[in-house]
UniProtKB/Swiss-Prot annotation:
GO annotation, cellular component aspect: host cell cytoplasm; host cell nucleus
Assembly and interaction partners: Homodimer. Interacts with host TRIM25 (via coiled coil); this interaction specifically inhibits TRIM25 multimerization and TRIM25-mediated RIGI CARD ubiquitination. Interacts with human EIF2AK2/PKR, CPSF4, IVNS1ABP and PABPN1.
Function: Inhibits post-transcriptional processing of cellular pre-mRNA, by binding and inhibiting two cellular proteins that are required for the 3'-end processing of cellular pre-mRNAs: the 30 kDa cleavage and polyadenylation specificity factor/CPSF4 and the poly(A)-binding protein 2/PABPN1. In turn, unprocessed 3' end pre-mRNAs accumulate in the host nucleus and are no longer exported to the cytoplasm. Cellular protein synthesis is thereby shut off very early after virus infection.
GO BP annotations listed: symbiont-mediated suppression of host cytoplasmic pattern recognition receptor signaling pathway via inhibition of RIG-I activity; symbiont-mediated suppression of host gene expression; symbiont-mediated suppression of host mRNA processing; symbiont-mediated suppression of host PKR/eIFalpha signaling; symbiont-mediated suppression of host type I interferon-mediated signaling pathway
Family annotation (SUPFAM superfamilies): Ns1 effector domain-like (SSF143021), S15/NS1 RNA-binding domain (SSF47060)
Main location as per UniProt: host cell
Positions of region (CPSF4-binding): 180-215
InterPro entries: NS1, NS1A, NS1A_effect_dom-like_sf, uS15_NS1_RNA-bd_sf
Region annotation RNA-binding and homodimerization: where it falls in the sequence: 1-73
Organism, scientific name: Influenza A virus (strain A/Memphis/102/1972 H3N2)
One protein family per Pfam: Flu_NS1
Motif (Nuclear export signal): 137-146
Family: Belongs to the influenza A viruses NS1 family.
Protein name: Non-structural protein 1
Length: 220
C-alpha cells in the first residue's frame, strides 16, 4: 500500500474530526454540514477499502497536522491562502429537498464511474427538472454533492450521488451520469430539463429548453 495514500487518509480523518467539532459547537452553516456528512460516508468507504481503522487513523493524522503547523510560518500560511482559489457552494435544492427520503416503485440503479445513478422506472409522462447542489471553482463544477430529479408535483424520481468508496470525480463524470439519468427517464416518455444553474457550471451555457448539449457518449 502506498504510504502517501495512507497518510492522506489519516490527515483527512483528523480534519473531518476538527470539522465535526465545529458543527458540534453550532458554528457550521448548511453547506458545511452537508459536506461533513458526505465526507463521512467517503471516509468510511476509504477506510474499508484500505483496511484501516478510522479512530487510529485520526490520531496519526493529528500528529501529522501538528508537525506541519509547528513548522509552518505565519507568512507562508498567508501566501498559501492568497494563492489558493476559493470554491463556492451552489444550491439548486433546499435543505428539505436535499435531505428528504424517497422511495422507488420500480428501482433501477447503475454505477457510472465514481457516481451512482438511481431511477424510478415507474414514472411515465411527467415533466421532470434536474436540480443539484455542488461546489464551483473557476466558474466550473468542481464537486457534485447530490443531484435529484423532481416532478412538477415535487416528487423525487431520480438521483445521482458520489460513491462513498470511490472518492473524487470529474466534470465529465457528472455530465456522463446526467446523460444516463436523462436517457433512463426519457425511456418512459418523460420530458426532462436541467436547471439553468447546473447547465451554466457544467456545460458553460444554458439553453431555454433546459437541454444541455449531450455528446453521443452522454446520451446512453
Amino acid at each position: 500500500m502506498d504510504s502517501n495514500t495512507v497518510s492522506s487518509f489519516q490527515v483527512d480523518c483528523f480534519l473531518w474530526h476538527v470539522r465535526k467539532q465545529v458543527v458540534d459547537q453550532e458554528l457550521g452553516d448548511a453547506p458545511f454540514l452537508d459536506r461533513l456528512r458526505r465526507d463521512q460516508k467517503s471516509l468510511r468507504g476509504r477506510g474499508s477499502t484500505l483496511g484501516l481503522n478510522i479512530e487510529a487513523a485520526t490520531h496519526v493524522g493529528k500528529q501529522i497536522v501538528e508537525k506541519i503547523l509547528k513548522e509552518e510560518s505565519d507568512e507562508a500560511l498567508k501566501m498559501t491562502m492568497a494563492s489558493t482559489p476559493a470554491s463556492r457552494y451552489i444550491t439548486d435544492m433546499t435543505i428539505e429537498e436535499l435531505s428528504r427520503d424517497w422511495f422507488m416503485l420500480m428501482p433501477k440503479q447503475k454505477v457510472e464511474g465514481p457516481l451512482c445513478i438511481r431511477i424510478d422506472q415507474a414514472i411515465m409522462d411527467k415533466n421532470i427538472m434536474l436540480k443539484a447542489n455542488f461546489s464551483v471553482i473557476f466558474d466550473r463544477l468542481e464537486t457534485l454533492i447530490l443531484l435529484r430529479a423532481f416532478t412538477e408535483e415535487g416528487a423525487i424520481v431520480g438521483e445521482i450521488s458520489p460513491l462513498p468508496s470511490f472518492p473524487g470525480h470529474t466534470i465529465e463524470d457528472v455530465k456522463n451520469a446526467i446523460g444516463v439519468l436523462i436517457g433512463g427517464l426519457e425511456w418512459n416518455d418523460n420530458t426532462v430539463r436541467v436547471s439553468k444553474t447546473l447547465q451554466r457550471f457544467a456545460w458553460g451555457s444554458s439553453n431555454e429548453n433546459g437541454r444541455p448539449p449531450l455528446t453521443p457518449k452522454q446520451k446512453r
